[in-house]
Amino acid sequence: MNIRSNPDTTLPAVTTGPLPSSRKIYAVPDSAPDLRVPLREIILSEAASEPNLPVYDTSGPYTDPSVTIDVNAGLPRNRIAWVLERGGVEEYVGRDIKPEDNGNVGADKAAKAFTAHHKPLRGLDGHKITQLEFARAGIVTKEMIYVAERENLGRKVQLERAEAALADGESFGASVPAFITPEFVRDEIARGRAIIPCNINHAELEPMIIGRNFLTKINANIGNSAVTSSVEEEVDKMVWAIRWGADTVMDLSTGRNIHTTREWILRNSPVPIGTVPIYQALEKCNGDPVALTWELYKDTLIEQCEQGVDYFTIHAGVRLQYIHLTASRVTGIVSRGGSIMAKWCLAHHKESFLYTHFDEICDIMRKYDVSFSLGDGLRPGSIADANDRAQFAELETLGELTKIAWDKGCQVMIEGPGHVPMHKIKINMDKQLKECGEAPFYTLGPLTTDIAPGYDHITSGIGAAMIGWFGCAMLCYVTPKEHLGLPDRNDVKTGVITYKIAAHAADLAKGHPAAQLRDDALSRARFEFRWTDQFNLGLDPDTAKSFHDETLPKEAHKVAHFCSMCGPKFCSMKITQDVRDYAATLNDPATVGMTISGTIEDGMAQMSAKFKEMGGSVYLDAEKVKESNKALS
């Protein structure tokens, strides 16, 4: 791990360099030899006697030692050529940055601006712009080819075991193929069952796909607030989150310098960036929801589209007629965006402008291929409120809005709860699929109990694994600081690792091809006491190694056939290996290589023959038995 500083900037050093015993490799799709799709190869020890293991990689160029990282310049804008090659777009001057874009921050509090500006692109009328429009027209884009190669992890070996893997899981109606082709990706997008969030102005993006027939993805939330954090910290947290496996990142900043913070993040992010535009719109009217207007919100949408935001959370399902349904709740309306719109609706006694102007919102987002993440502003904030009428009324409206957005050519995913006990989780998935036409589901957890402040990454990880198994396409992480404070980089890592576990467990349960390869590789390393391979095959090699080294720090302990839990005499795996070694060294050559069960059967047969040889009596002379045993030894 290297910490690279950036000259002439107040921005922090960001974490670069590969993870332990890993290297960046690139797969080249057969149908697009000009593309280089990143993967991480875990390098196994010589004792492993098996190939290195390629795994999905979200870390971008930050883990490639051959790339020079300069946060001031941003990442390479590789995708701009793909967009221009397709045509149907124009470059234009774009709107000016206004003081209110950064919360009217004074010069003494203003963050350093990102100076490497590029003119924004937008789609032309009458041309295909979005991935959905291309997919419906039967056109396979480079983004589709790219994500297909990524999903396959560069491992055609999975074809050999895909049928067995699929048979071992319960997919609950998902249609995960043995091998992901670009055509399959195109078809899933055309059906609305998957999205590739990829604003045409986010040229630094490494495309990824969200859908229940693909690997389960996770999102990490970052962002400053009015009381804490800075641009420096948020850029650092973004790089840190993707290092550990965040597939997308949402910038939920609500304090000063919102525009500037977002610009630094976008220009340095290889993963899709999402936002909640109402947060910035609220800052522009000094935090007063009643003062919000459609014109102000529209201007904010265009501002963020031009910057390159890949998906917007828009709480258009919070309608005036639903607000009274939350009156009897234990925790009322807990969504920030939902509460803002509820207050606006009640103050003006009007339908939400997000709902009444939804067609126009679609037209704006389509020009930049910004995906919808239709927000659940009425999600339950406690298990007591789970699955109530307010929650499901909003979900039904989101289903209606999904069809409108699809008709306009926009990509859509649906946000979900929240706080839901385990026995009420599946109905959420089933109802979402039914109401929203199988659009991808994206949930916050859900948290399965409310009794564990400080441990809500665990309470939510349980629900996340379950709903991921049932078909949820992306899981929004929860950190230990949930309900308590703004997460720092340690909390971000804990949240990401927790949700990588949940997502992987869901893929295993669905029978996703090749999901188990990493588990099996680690299990073999564990049984063979290849400690270093165990660490490196895990999701967090650093923590695994540090835990082991707390009690067995010497290098010699990395090859020891025991750990500090059981010690050398009580290790079950060591005992099992001893049994196998015994089977391999029996005098009878026929027993060499015999399995444990075979050894047992052979031993039983020997004792049966001995019983008959000594007369077949139940009770025998002790001295004769002793003499017989000596003969066998």
Swiss-Prot record:
Its cofactor is [4Fe-4S] cluster. InterPro entries: ThiC, ThiC-associated_dom, ThiC/Bza_core_dom, ThiC/BzaA/B. Substrate binds at N221, M250, Y279, H315, S335, R336, G337, D376, G377, L378, R379, E415, Y442. Binds 1 [4Fe-4S] cluster per subunit. The cluster is coordinated with 3 cysteines and an exchangeable S-adenosyl-L-methionine. Keywords: 4Fe-4S, Iron, Iron-sulfur, Lyase, Metal-binding, S-adenosyl-L-methionine, Thiamine biosynthesis, Zinc. GO terms for molecular function: 4 iron, 4 sulfur cluster binding; carbon-carbon lyase activity; zinc ion binding. Residues 1-20 are annotated as: Disordered. Residues 1-13 have a biased composition (Polar residues). Catalyzes the synthesis of the hydroxymethylpyrimidine phosphate (HMP-P) moiety of thiamine from aminoimidazole ribotide (AIR) in a radical S-adenosyl-L-methionine (SAM)-dependent reaction. Homodimer. This is Phosphomethylpyrimidine synthase. It comes from Bradyrhizobium sp. (strain ORS 278).
